[in-house]
UniProtKB/Swiss-Prot annotation:
NCBIfam families: deoD, PRK05819.1. The active site is at D204. The keyword Mitochondrion does not apply. InterPro entries: DeoD-type (IPR004402), Nucleoside_phosphorylase_CS (IPR018016), Nucleoside_phosphorylase_d (IPR000845), Nucleoside_phosphorylase_sf (IPR035994). It holds the Pfam family PNP_UDP_1. A purine D-ribonucleoside binds at H4, E179, M180, E181, S203, D204. One of its GO terms (biological process) is purine nucleoside catabolic process. It catalyses: a purine D-ribonucleoside + phosphate = a purine nucleobase + alpha-D-ribose 1-phosphate; a purine 2'-deoxy-D-ribonucleoside + phosphate = a purine nucleobase + 2-deoxy-alpha-D-ribose 1-phosphate. The record marks R217 as: Important for catalytic activity. This is Purine nucleoside phosphorylase DeoD-type. The keyword Transferase applies. It comes from Exiguobacterium sp. (strain ATCC BAA-1283 / AT1b).
């Protein structure tokens, strides 16, 4: 057991999907996995292990934001030996050609995250996805006929910003979407020499105001999940 995850040794697979919402973790496990075992419900942050296409896969809720996500990622890696970490989450679109419900694969993540400012003594670090995971995810989406966009995103520290124009600068420099975890995930993966990828569904749009419901965010977005799972089985022993 670790501080925030109540699993025993061997209960968590080497490849873990990471939704922020613990209820999305439950949905993924119940909808897509077979032989499912609940290994964690500490603080209501559900974690499950099951099989998908014959391979053991885990899914662990992380909560919102880099600080919460970092707790679970550190423990998954250091206490349970996770090797492949795939975030499946939602984001806000900030480009006109990125529509609500589109799937976005995050090649890299700019950020305003305070953790890296402290970690790198004020210098800038460029957190990026593991290319092997990114390439496999893109090819799996192509094979399944699921249109995806690949590019840079922005990881925000605040969900509610004082100034919307703060995001316009990132859009001007090509960021596709805004979310709250990817830069932290990619940084920790690099530190611990494991693999990481972020696959997102656009749940709302900062330019048009279009948005999905909380129920839809919790229990749909199946295209993103299928791409993540098909990628997971390819890198799982």
């Amino acid at each position: 057991m670790s501080v925030h995850i109540g699993a025993q040794e061997g209960q968590i697979a080497e490849t873990v999907l990471l939704p922020g919402d613990p209820l999305r973790a439950k949905y993924i496990a119940e909808t897509f996995l077979e032989d499912v075992e609940l290994y964690n419900e500490v603080r209501g942050m559900y974690g499950f292990t099951g099989t998908y296409k014959g391979k053991r896969i885990s899914v662990q809720g992380t909560g919102m934001g880099v600080p919460s996500m970092s707790i679970y990622v550190n423990e998954l890696i250091m206490s349970y030996g996770a090797k492949n970490l795939i975030r499946v989450g939602t984001a806000g679109g900030i480009q006109e050609d990125v529509k609500v419900r589109d799937v976005v694969i995050a090649m890299s993540a700019s950020s305003e995250m305070g953790q890296n400012r402290v970690r790198f003594n004020g210098m800038d670090y460029a957190p990026t996805a593991t290319f092997d995971l990114l390439h496999r995810a893109y090819m799996n989406a192509e094979k399944a006929g699921i249109p995806v966009k690949v590019g840079q995103i922005f990881t925000a520290d605040q969900f509610y910003q004082d100034d919307f124009h703060h995001f316009k600068k990132w859009a001007d420099f090509g960021c596709l979407a805004i979310e709250m975890e990817a830069a932290g995930l990619y940084t920790l993966a690099a530190k611990h020499k494991v693999n990481a990828l972020t696959i997102l569904t656009i749940s709302d749009h900062l330019l048009t105001g279009e948005e999905t419901t909380s129920e839809e965010r919790q229990s749909t977005f199946d295209e993103m999940i299928r791409v993540a799972l098909d990628t997971a089985v390819e890198v799982t022993n």
